[in-house]
């Protein structure tokens, strides 16, 4: 994704999540009383999510038109299918910033596909073809591993998918792994013009031609860079403009679960990310849960962002836990 005046914040302490319950009120017409009915939310397994992140990284950089990209795409589709999802492979030839044809593949897993009430969960699975933010200029044309920027959001959602198979929520859930989010114009080729259209190619394509004709969802949650050590998440600007009630819902859940040190009660800047096409083209209110840091000098997304250091060393199970348990809480409390 491309930074748009992104605000930065100091990392706070780490909190662990576990099995949680939320209460919904049920009124008895006969007695005129209100009782509490507990909603059982599954426990997110951070070890499982960590493994899913590592298995993606083990393929190497998942860049467009590469063997690793093909193999990892097959792995992700097979994983979703093994968890009981109806899987769609949406393939398309898309045009990169330099005019080259990129073989894109959006991977969609639909849980309870016949349900009318649906929630969309998404992340991008491709990795940046260029480490163009690396402090060593010699690395700028090398692809990154994308453990955090790519694999972390997908890893969290694969664990969510595993839980959906074991305990079905009251609604339908669609998990989308968008391709070609991170093939936007590299810094060494940037011009003074607006190049925002060169990013988020997979989500742009899906938003114009969804996997199901007339597709709709109540709301969407995008996960991007959600596995780094000491990660903090601010209320991203476009999310607040286009889906403020969803932001409120997610941040409230995180605070209730004890993850307020990750989900900071403060507005952040604006980020050009996959939630943009979901909001603006598909017209589904979608928010972006994305890392922001005050202490890192190279980028508010972390010193390892778009560098060769974005590897498994930066991934923290506690961060995966905070994000994953929060997402599960939101999904299972939807009626």
Go through each PLM region and give its residues.
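N-terminal capping segment at the start of a domain
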Residues: 27-72, 83, 297-314
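Acidic/histidine-rich catalytic neighborhood of metal-dependent amide-processing enzymes
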Residues: 141-242, 274
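Second-shell loop/turn segments in exported
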Residues: 36-43, 58-67, 94-97, 139-150, ...
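A non-catalytic alpha/beta surface segment that caps or lines the substrate-entry region
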Residues: 54, 58-114
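Bacterial signal peptide processing site
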Residues: 22-25
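Active-site-adjacent substrate-binding region
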Residues: 91, 101, 219, 226-335
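C-terminal motif of bacterial Sec signal peptides marking the signal peptidase cleavage site
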Residues: 17-20
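Solvent-exposed loop/turn segments at secondary-structure junctions
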Residues: 62-64, 93-96, 114-115, 125-129, ...
């Amino acid at each position: 994704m491309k930074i748009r005046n992104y605000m930065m914040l100091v990392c706070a302490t780490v909190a662990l999540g576990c099995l949680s319950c939320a209460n919904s009120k049920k009124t008895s017409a006969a007695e005129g009383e209100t009782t509490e009915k507990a909603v059982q939310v599954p426990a997110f397994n951070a070890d499982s999510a960590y493994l899913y992140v590592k298995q993606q990284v083990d393929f190497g950089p998942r860049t467009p038109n590469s063997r690793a990209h093909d193999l990892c795409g097959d792995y992700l589709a097979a994983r979703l299918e093994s968890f009981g999802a109806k899987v769609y492979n949406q393939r398309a030839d898309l045009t990169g910033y330099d005019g080259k044809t990129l073989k894109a593949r959006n991977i969609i897993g639909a849980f309870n596909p016949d349900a009318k009430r649906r929630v969309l969960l998404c992340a991008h699975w491709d990795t940046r073809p260029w480490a163009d933010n690396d402090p060593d200029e010699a690395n700028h044309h090398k692809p990154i591993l994308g453990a955090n920027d790519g694999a972390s959001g997908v890893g969290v959602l694969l664990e969510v998918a595993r839980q959906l198979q074991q305990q079905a929520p009251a609604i339908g859930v669609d998990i989308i792994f968008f391709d070609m989010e991170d093939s936007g114009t590299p810094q060494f080729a940037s011009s003074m013009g607006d190049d925002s259209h060169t990013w988020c190619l997979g989500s742009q394509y899906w938003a114009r031609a969804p996997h199901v004709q007339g597709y709709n969802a109540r709301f969407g949650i995008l996960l991007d860079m959600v596995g780094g050590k000491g990660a903090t998440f601010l209320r991203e600007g476009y999310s607040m403009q286009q889906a403020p009630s969803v932001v409120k819902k997610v941040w409230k859940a995180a605070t209730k679960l004890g993850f307020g040190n990750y989900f900071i009660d403060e507005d952040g800047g604006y980020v050009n990310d996959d939630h943009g096409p979901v909001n603006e083209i598909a017209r589904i209110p979608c928010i972006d849960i994305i890392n922001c840091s005050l202490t890192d000098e190279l980028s508010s997304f972390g010193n390892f962002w778009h560098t060769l250091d974005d590897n498994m060393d930066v991934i923290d199970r506690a961060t995966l836990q905070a994000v994953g348990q929060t997402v599960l809480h939101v999904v299972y409390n939807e009626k």
